[in-house]
Amino acid sequence: MGLLDYFRGSRTDSAAVAKERLQILVAHERAERNKPDYLPLLQKELLEVIRKYVNVGQDAITVTMEKDDNREVLELNVVLPDAIESRPKRKRG
């Protein structure tokens, strides 16, 4: 019955893998739920300001908020191109 045991063993393993994946998904959902509502708008506005001076892509900026015991950390990551191409200055007036 070694063949039968082989299939039974894989079911247990696949159930454990499925459970682990589900736990990861739930953890990500909970993390997303705890984000402030203004975070997407902040990211959009920061991208607009950066684009005034440097040509960057839509996904060049990430804004994350992390909570530790008694503090909150707002992390801003901006990926700049290798050769910085500044935008032409606009005439005021």
Swiss-Prot record:
Keyword set, alphabetical order: Cell cycle, Cell division
Lineage: superkingdom: Bacteria
UniProt record, GO biological process: cell division; regulation of division septum assembly
Presence of the UniProt keyword Cell division in the record: yes
Protein's job: Prevents the cell division inhibition by proteins MinC and MinD at internal division sites while permitting inhibition at polar sites. This ensures cell division at the proper site by restricting the formation of a division septum at the midpoint of the long axis of the cell.
Family, per entry: Belongs to the MinE family.
Protein's recorded name: Cell division topological specificity factor
